[in-house]
């Protein structure tokens, strides 16, 4: 092989590598911060509602799929908000606020009723207000100021931060891709055998233990599927009319 051949090869390949770098860099610049922030939000959720965080962390280390099933919904929500708003800080902040509120609600319900947060609880606004009235006025005041301050930060992030320029087709493809991924992943969250395959810390029939062992996010989404009413085999609606 002559010395000229490697040089010619490099001359041919370098332009292609530059094109690839130009394509990948914007994607990585967006994907990597969202990826790490999704893990950070998941860690925050686990820290808020897990009584034995080290045991949950041990489960995550032994079963990486369990960690992925808790992180992926956070990442998908961030991506969806990012493609809609075109603002990364706003998307991360709103996602963190939503999942943190979910974790706080689960922690309060678990401590007061020994039951985890269920999808049906989202419709019980009156009951939630009744529970809030049992808290001291100072706690409610601090919580209200905290929520208002957080909302102001979100509004500032939405209005002041410069949004990334997306072509309309690119935004639609991004939103469609996120929704498609969510639809496909839902088969994993609906799977009872998969849910039962992960170990439970303590009594396996106690739902609070299931949430503490598998993570709030995964367990909540599994319950959202498990609580759906299904028609029995051979059921004919006309026969009961």
Segments (PLM) and residue ranges:
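Extended, compositionally biased non-globular segments that define protein topology
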Residues: 2-122
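N-terminal secretory/membrane-targeting segments
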Residues: 95-241
């Amino acid at each position: 092989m002559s010395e000229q051949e490697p040089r010619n090869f490099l001359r041919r390949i370098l332009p292609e590598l530059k094109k690839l770098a130009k394509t990948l860099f914007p994607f990585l610049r967006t994907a990597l911060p969202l990826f790490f922030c999704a893990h950070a939000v998941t860690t925050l959720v686990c820290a808020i509602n897990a009584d034995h965080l080290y045991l949950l962390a041990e489960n995550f280390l032994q079963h990486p799929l369990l960690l992925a099933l808790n992180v992926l919904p956070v990442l998908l929500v961030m991506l969806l908000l990012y493609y809609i708003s075109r603002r990364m800080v706003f998307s991360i902040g709103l996602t963190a606020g939503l999942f943190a509120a979910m974790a706080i609600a689960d922690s309060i319900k678990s401590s007061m009723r020994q039951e985890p947060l269920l999808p049906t609880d989202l419709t019980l606004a009156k009951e939630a207000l009744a529970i809030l009235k049992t808290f001291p006025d100072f706690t409610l005041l601090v919580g209200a100021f905290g929520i208002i301050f957080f909302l102001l930060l979100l509004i500032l992030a939405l209005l002041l931060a410069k949004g990334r320029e997306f072509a309309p087709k690119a935004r639609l493809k991004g939103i469609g891709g996120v929704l498609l991924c969510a639809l496909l992943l839902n088969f994993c969250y609906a799977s009872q055998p998969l849910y039962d395959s992960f170990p439970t810390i303590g009594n396996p029939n106690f739902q609070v233990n299931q949430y503490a062992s598998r993570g709030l996010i995964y367990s909540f989404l599994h319950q959202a599927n498990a609580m759906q009413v299904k028609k029995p085999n051979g059921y004919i609606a006309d026969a009961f009319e």
